[in-house]
Amino acid sequence: MIHVRHRHLALLLLAFVLAYLLPLGFHGLWIPDETRYAQISQEMLYSGNWIAPHFMGLRYFEKPAAGYWLIALGQQVFGENLFGVRIASALASGLSVLLAYLLAGKIWNDPRKQFASALLFMSFGFVAGQAGYANLDPQFTFWTNVTLLAFWYAVHSVGRARLAAWALVGVACGIGFMTKGFLAWALPVIIALPYMLCQRRLAELLRFGPLAVLIAIAVCLPWALAIHQQEPDYWRYFFWHEHIRRFAGDNAQHAQPWWFYMPLLVAACVPWALLLPATLQQAWQEKNRPDIAFLLLWLLLPLAFLSLSKGKLPTYILPCLLPLALLMANTLVERLDRGHSTALRANGIFNATVTFLGLVALIYLQLEQPVYENEPMHLSLAIIVLFGWTLANALQGLRPLTCWATPALGSWLLIALLPAALPNDVINNKTPDPFVVRHQAELAGCTQLLSNDLGAASALAWRLKRPDVALFNTWGELEYGLGYPDVQGREVRLQDIDAWMKNARSQGRVGVIMRGKSDEELKELESLPRDGQRYDEGNLAILVYEKSAS
């Protein structure tokens, strides 16, 4: 059994390296998230201010600091490059895969269910996609997973092991809070309390829970006090704007209907989505088992809680996917043992059919109305991805009992190659930092920088290691930070651009990166002087203006 587990772990580690780590440095940072998190964490490195997050030199209080610390650490260790920015997400996702493996082992002590749990979780589309994407959700998901794994260990241990597990609950809650806020406390409570009530062990929760609470507070308190001292308005803004208004406000950011997460849960577990009905059916039939009850509560209660919120983003459901992977693995392995292949066969055939039709559609469009313009490499990679996905899922459909795991190969191939297989039209408009790199030598000598797009501005700031980009007729999420008196003059309105440009050029060379897609953006682009050196890529333009004659 030990040899089997070692082989399983070796396979998972190989998949982690090939699918999660290797692709990290081969495509530009996606806007708006990746460039934002890269720049904020880089600014921590250069400013030495590890307490209060700043975005392009402006106060940015949408999240606490700990998530930025890990991204900054990645850049400190691996360099201020694409790999360094993304490594925190990849490691957090990889460690969550390990947690799925460990929790399945603790619950069932079955190597096949352990391996299936980790493999399913690692190949879920949402999980694998976020592993190569620099944001805070993989980190927050990891700390939530640690919290609930430690809770399960705590309620199934005695003596010092139980105390250590409760202490780990507190540590993980504390770091989770410093990563993304109060949700790190809410999710464990809404899962643990009903579970202990159902198991008639509420007294145990009341006895040991305060230990976890005290440790969580002890972990958070130094930073919480430090940021209050440095930025007295932080907690008001973070609590009311980022939590209360987003949860219940009529004008909540990213507002979506209550049912938003239902179809999204199906999409999140692709390429295993057709196993979902059988998984939920079996879990409901076995809901009286403590292990299944715990996993069901972990899956459903956060989903219900998040559905009540007015503001919703797809990645918010990431903490629900580890229990889903375990429930699905339990169903899958038991069906394999009984020789039941219907659900697996249907899953493989459905996935292969959809992707094959996508491949046919791509070839047809390429012949009739090309998606790829003189991009043989990108087109070849797209065909490889679609063909590989089709083949991997067709194997499951044809031989479901022996090739049940092959959809994971298709998922990992997709995640590894898709960013490089996209058309230039998408890449050029959504990843501006390679465009900046190609003209970095000219931009580096500029004394003033300007942009009308926050994503492009943050890419420029990160690549040039300069947060002082002036914001031309755009502020968006930086509106709060721009309201402080010590940063006045960072925004440039349309009616003031001539005066700003004249003053800036009197001091030295001026570098500008502009987006010219909407009518308003085109108007902003037209308002700039015509005597600059201009470079265009997609709907982005870089302009370099020489210093004006004195």
Curated annotation (Swiss-Prot):
Protein species of origin: Pseudomonas syringae pv. syringae (strain B728a)
GO biological process, one term: response to iron(III) ion
One Gene Ontology CC term in the entry: plasma membrane
Reactions catalysed: 4-amino-4-deoxy-alpha-L-arabinopyranosyl di-trans,octa-cis-undecaprenyl phosphate + lipid IVA = lipid IIA + di-trans,octa-cis-undecaprenyl phosphate
EC number: 2.4.2.43
Subcellular location: Cell inner membrane
Major localization class: membrane
Lineage, highest ranks first: Bacteria, Pseudomonadati, Pseudomonadota, Gammaproteobacteria, Pseudomonadales
Name used for this protein in its record: Undecaprenyl phosphate-alpha-4-amino-4-deoxy-L-arabinose arabinosyl transferase
Pathways per UniProt: Lipopolysaccharide metabolism; 4-amino-4-deoxy-beta-L-arabinose-lipid A biosynthesis
Protein function: Catalyzes the transfer of the L-Ara4N moiety of the glycolipid undecaprenyl phosphate-alpha-L-Ara4N to lipid A. The modified arabinose is attached to lipid A and is required for resistance to polymyxin and cationic antimicrobial peptides.
One example GO MF annotation: mannosyltransferase activity
Family per record: Belongs to the glycosyltransferase 83 family.
Keywords in alphabetical order: Cell inner membrane, Cell membrane, Glycosyltransferase, Lipid A biosynthesis, Lipid biosynthesis, Lipid metabolism, Lipopolysaccharide biosynthesis, Membrane, Transferase, Transmembrane, Transmembrane helix
Group of enzyme by EC: transferase
